[in-house]
């Protein structure tokens, strides 16, 4: 399988987490793009017109008992929506309805507590047990009946929570002999999810001028986030290393595509900005206090500065009033494999240009290409 992520093109992206087991595992297909993450990203984008980033945290061993510990390590405040798929194991193990209700209530309350105030949670019901070939038997009928009972409880618990929605699961279509699940099954499930998710995502999407959770963070939270971000930077092992063609190629493409004098993949490291890759006559290292990237990484979306000389954040910046006389900047955050914003893919020019001329979809795609290289490097390492 490829990296546990999927993306669909667009701007103003929604960030989704799929967590659990069962349909989240992607059995039957060769990539997450063909499985539920990719299918859901495309289905949501088709409805919203926005980009979608889907992160996957799935394991066959994940259960209702292990879920709280696994979820609290994922920084849930990053996500606009969280999809949970659990229950088949509990249905087959005949977990008591009382225990299921108690533990599920605790889990979903934890999710609402640890996520942001605009995050919506979607609890996917059990796939009909006998639609799973290995359990299509009289013994499977017992688990199937219990799964229905657990789903009734799940629906009741979800109804009692303000940001949680229950979505009943459908059976996978009967596929070719010997094949368990196909890309068609994942597309169908993604459409089912997207039908329920689209409206809450639209309603919860931050309007211009609203404060993001990151902007509302208390000073101590900002410190904690910065420490986690720096650990992610250090863990990549790329600081002060030689240029690599895999990054330089993407940066050069950015420069050509946007027609700018400079382009770079920048990394914010303690009190400096260091460029892992850059094209054009631009310093490889500058103080963080002068860095446009330092502003870019404060939010998940793009930063576009049409004319730095008229922007109050940058008009006194030594790089604007002196060499190299930056006027235009566009950057998109680059995330580490663990989700911290460690730098940016950016393009810069000494001439201003209208914001409307900037292809933000392309800028995001180039930043995602850098992220893909970072993730591949982490897997190899």
How would you name each of these model-derived features?
Residues 262, 267-268, 272-276, 283-327:
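Regulatory sensory and allosteric helical modules in signal-transduction proteins
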Residues 15-17, 23-102:
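Conserved SGNH/GDSL esterase-like catalytic core that processes O-acyl groups on lipids
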Residues 210-290, 358-360, 364-381:
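Intrinsically disordered, low-complexity terminal regulatory regions
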Residues 327-336:
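A short, aliphatic-rich beta-strand micro-motif
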Residues 177-213:
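Histidine-centered active-site loop/cap adjacent to the catalytic His
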Residues 1-17, 201-204:
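N-terminal secretory targeting modules
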Residues 131-167:
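Substrate-gating cap/lid alpha-helix
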Residues 344-353:
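Short beta-strand-to-loop transition segments that serve as allosteric relay/switch motifs
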């Amino acid at each position: 399988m490829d990296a546990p992520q999927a993306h669909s093109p667009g701007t103003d992206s929604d960030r989704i987490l799929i967590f659990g087991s069962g349909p989240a595992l992607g059995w039957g297909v060769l990539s997450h793009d063909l499985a539920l993450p990719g299918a859901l990203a495309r289905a949501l984008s088709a409805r919203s017109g926005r980009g979608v980033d889907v992160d996957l945290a799935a394991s066959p061993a994940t259960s209702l008992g292990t879920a709280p510990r696994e979820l609290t390590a994922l920084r849930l405040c990053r996500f606009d929506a969280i999809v949970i798929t659990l229950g088949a194991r509990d249905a087959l193990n005949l977990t008591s309805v009382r225990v299921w209700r108690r533990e599920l209530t605790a889990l979903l309350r934890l999710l609402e507590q640890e996520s942001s105030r605009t995050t919506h949670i979607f609890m996917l019901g059990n796939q009909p047990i006998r639609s799973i070939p290995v359990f299509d038997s009289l013994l499977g009928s017992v688990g199937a009946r219990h799964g229905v009972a657990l789903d009734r409880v799940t629906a009741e618990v979800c109804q009692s929570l303000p940001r949680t929605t229950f979505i009943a699961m459908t059976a996978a279509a009967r596929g070719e002999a010997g094949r368990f699940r196909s890309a068609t099954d994942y597309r169908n499930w993604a459409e089912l999810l997207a039908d329920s998710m689209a409206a809450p995502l639209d309603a919860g999407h931050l309007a211009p001028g609203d404060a993001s959770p990151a902007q509302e963070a208390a000073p101590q939270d900002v410190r904690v986030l910065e420490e986690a971000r720096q650990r992610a930077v250090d863990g990549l092992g790329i600081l002060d290393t030689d240029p690599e063609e895999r990054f330089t190629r993407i940066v050069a493409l950015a420069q050509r595509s946007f027609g700018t004098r400079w382009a770079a993949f920048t990394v914010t490291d303690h009190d400096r900005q260091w460029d892992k890759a850059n094209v054009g006559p631009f310093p490889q290292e500058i103080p963080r206090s002068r860095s446009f990237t330092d502003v870019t990484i404060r939010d998940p979306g793009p930063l576009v500065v049409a004319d730095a000389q008229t922007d109050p954040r940058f008009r006194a910046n030594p790089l604007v009033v002196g060499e190299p006389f930056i006027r235009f900047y566009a950057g998109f955050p680059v995330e580490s494999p663990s989700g911290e914003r460690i730098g940016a893919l950016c393009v810069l020019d000494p001439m201003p240009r209208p914001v409307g001329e900037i292809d933000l979809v392309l800028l995001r795609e180039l930043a995602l290409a850098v992220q893909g290289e970072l993730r591949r490097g982490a897997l190899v390492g």
